[in-house]
Amino acid sequence: MLDKHERNINYMRISLTDRCNLRCRYCMPETGVDNLTHYSILSLEEMARLVRIASELGIQKIRLTGGEPLVRRNVPQLISYIAQIPRIDDIALTTNGTLFAALAEELKTAGLNRINFSLDSLVPEKFKYITRRGDLSKVKEAIFKALELDMHPVKINMVVIRGFNDDEIIDFVELARKYPLHVRFIEFMPVGDLLFWKKDRMMPAQDIKAYIEESYVLTPQKNILGNGPARYYSLEGGEGSLGFISPMSNHFCGECNRIRLTAEGGLRGCLYDKREVNLKTALKNGSSDEEIKELFIWAIKAKPARHHMNNGWGEENKRKMYQIGG
């Protein structure tokens, strides 16, 4: 379905939960947050129904996010439900990786096609610092398990934070050189715990790329499967590729093809737009598929031309990334 800016909206991101087993400093306070109750979030069956309705409007790709999606029970069951919807041709998951290895084979059997790992440091002490409680060895195990199961493309998302992990950029490049991994460097954004956010910690994607090109030859390539916002480059002599995501310095809104569904049923056209359509209430009130479809149409038509994060969005928006879906 086309929005009013002639963008083809064919991708929906679904937050399964606002809970997480980590406490990343730029995302969530150390003490955690007041999590949603079981009764306030969508059931797996409700999520599957909404995916089916959305597919009738042209949604083809689904990504499951959180919080940490794998802290929710029965994720393979949800994936199995979604995989049976005829118009859905791609199911992906974004995870911190700490719980993935034990579930990997079950997830793939259920119908999971692709996986993205959020990983900001390869140094155990720094990883523990940024996550406040994570075990890096579990994430590494998960990444290689995904490769073993041929869940290609396997992507690693690194949020580059100047003064914290910018000295590890080359280490992440080496992962893409040695293994068939697609490493994406993401600009630091004000979308979580604003006490950790400082504008001078944001390293522009063009600076990251220029730094890498001092040591490596990069060649532009077609976008990797996933219809995401990254600009991809092959790495001379490398097994994988590099991607650069620049929401702060060079937004990609003109190509945005996604809508977002929160765990409690809020449908929004943009991560940075505070307007939401409450689908949970519609489901509770017994709305028909056609009535719910009209709510999807409204949300898609209301999708803004671009975000305004550089104009102080972070200070105004009370909803954090773990609540909306990363």
From Swiss-Prot:
Family matches, as SUPFAM superfamilies: Radical SAM enzymes (SSF102114)
Cofactor dependence: [4Fe-4S] cluster
Cofactor note text: Binds 2 [4Fe-4S] clusters. Binds 1 [4Fe-4S] cluster coordinated with 3 cysteines and an exchangeable S-adenosyl-L-methionine and 1 [4Fe-4S] cluster coordinated with 3 cysteines and the GTP-derived substrate.
Residue sites binding [4Fe-4S] cluster 2 per the record: C253, C256, C270
Enzyme class: lyase
EC number: 4.1.99.22
Keywords assigned: 4Fe-4S, GTP-binding, Iron, Iron-sulfur, Lyase, Metal-binding, Molybdenum cofactor biosynthesis, Nucleotide-binding, S-adenosyl-L-methionine
Coiled coil (UniProt feature): none
PROSITE patterns, A to Z: MOAA_NIFB_PQQE, RADICAL_SAM
Binding site for S-adenosyl-L-methionine: Y26, G67, S118, M189
Gene3D superfamilies: Aldolase class I
Binding site for [4Fe-4S] cluster 1: C20, C24, C27
Listed pathway(s): Cofactor biosynthesis; molybdopterin biosynthesis
Domain of life: Bacteria
Positions of GTP binding: R13, R63, T94, K155, R258, I259, R260
Pfam families, per database record: Fer4_12, Mob_synth_C, Radical_SAM
Reaction(s) the record says it catalyses: GTP + AH2 + S-adenosyl-L-methionine = (8S)-3',8-cyclo-7,8-dihydroguanosine 5'-triphosphate + 5'-deoxyadenosine + L-methionine + A + H(+)
Annotated ranges, domain Radical SAM core: 4-227
GO molecular function: 4 iron, 4 sulfur cluster binding; cyclic pyranopterin monophosphate synthase activity; GTP 3',8'-cyclase activity; GTP binding; metal ion binding; S-adenosyl-L-methionine binding
Biological processes per GO annotation: Mo-molybdopterin cofactor biosynthetic process
Subunit description: Monomer and homodimer.
Family: Belongs to the radical SAM superfamily. MoaA family.
Function, as annotated: Catalyzes the cyclization of GTP to (8S)-3',8-cyclo-7,8-dihydroguanosine 5'-triphosphate.
Protein's UniProt name: GTP 3',8-cyclase
Source species of the chain: Syntrophomonas wolfei subsp. wolfei (strain DSM 2245B / Goettingen)
Classification of source organism: Bacteria, Bacillati, Bacillota, Clostridia, Eubacteriales
